[in-house]
Amino acid sequence: MSASGLPFDDFRELIRNLPGPDLGAERAVREREVTLTKPAGSLGRLEEIVAWLATWTGKRTPQVNRPLVAVFAGNHGVTAKNITPFPPSVTAQMVENFAAGGAAINQICIANDLGLKVFDLALEHPTGDITEEAAMDERTCAATMAFGMEAIAGGTDLLCIGEMGIGNTTIAAAIALALFGGTAEDWVGPGTGSTGELMQRKLAAVRLAVALHQPHLQDPLEVLRCLGGREIAAMAGAILAARMEKIPVIVDGFVASAAAAVLYAANPEAIDHCMFGQVSAEPGHRKLLAKMGKEPLLDLGMRLGEGTGAALAANIVKAAALCHSGMATFEQAGVSASK
């Protein structure tokens, strides 16, 4: 903890002083790219992905050998306002399903040869109902961010961030509204299927929560504390830890992007090592990516969460790295280069 004794101060200092890009590694990748047996630029965005990998790993021949999907699960007190068709008990049930190998993310990880870790964040203790009180106190929020930083402890060279939590699209919408303004209608979507009266209650909850906590919402970490969830705080911590350890990150959908948005609002450079795996069908996600100036890799109409979009995108990143490292140069292959 910092000398001031305030739990967030260490994170504020960290966010202000993050390691920057390795421009030498990026330059080396771009120089090799033009020597490979293909027309310059013909692999399109794959070439930019390799440059991004080099920039944030510091490796001149970037590889992806230990990709990991980290899924963070949390529960939310605001679900007591009857804003979602599923009860909060589903969060714990889905965590058990992940452990048993029965969820969509398990199958995608098998298909793409990705590691998977699931983090259960005190599911029996939901965060505070944000329409009545702060989601967390500062100490709890900071401790949860620190817990999220441990996601990389086992070693990985590409971190995919995902989540599970009934009610957390409401939380993500409230965070987006607090950070970027607009109206609740700009950010609130159906989530797991909220329509009709459920949708109206969801909209009302977001409006009420942002109005209630307005005096605290000038500081992005206070936005996280007042309106966030444990899984969102943990994802923010994981993103920061990855930056410190030169690990590129693929962010999944709307909720995971809300965690990244908190860091972006504190320092726009804090998520430069992040790629956004997909734009989800949740309507606020496309707007949120636009606010951060981010272009997603995939647009498949998905809105499941669980890290599924990030995991699918990881295979594209793996392929990009292999194309760069494995392709022969014109000289090696005896192929004539362009004039």
Curated annotation (Swiss-Prot):
GO terms for molecular function: nicotinate-nucleotide-dimethylbenzimidazole phosphoribosyltransferase activity. It catalyses: 5,6-dimethylbenzimidazole + nicotinate beta-D-ribonucleotide = alpha-ribazole 5'-phosphate + nicotinate + H(+). Its EC number is 2.4.2.21. It comes from the Bacteria. Pathway: Nucleoside biosynthesis; alpha-ribazole biosynthesis; alpha-ribazole from 5,6-dimethylbenzimidazole: step 1/2. InterPro entries: Nict_dMeBzImd_PRibTrfase (IPR003200), Nict_dMeBzImd_PRibTrfase_bact (IPR017846), Nict_dMeBzImd_PRibTrfase_N (IPR023195), Nict_dMeBzImd_PRibTrfase_sf (IPR036087). Keywords: Cobalamin biosynthesis, Glycosyltransferase, Transferase. HAMAP family: CobT. Catalyzes the synthesis of alpha-ribazole-5'-phosphate from nicotinate mononucleotide (NAMN) and 5,6-dimethylbenzimidazole (DMB). NCBIfam families: cobT_DBIPRT, PRK00105.1. This is Nicotinate-nucleotide--dimethylbenzimidazole phosphoribosyltransferase. It comes from Brucella melitensis biotype 1 (strain ATCC 23456 / CCUG 17765 / NCTC 10094 / 16M).
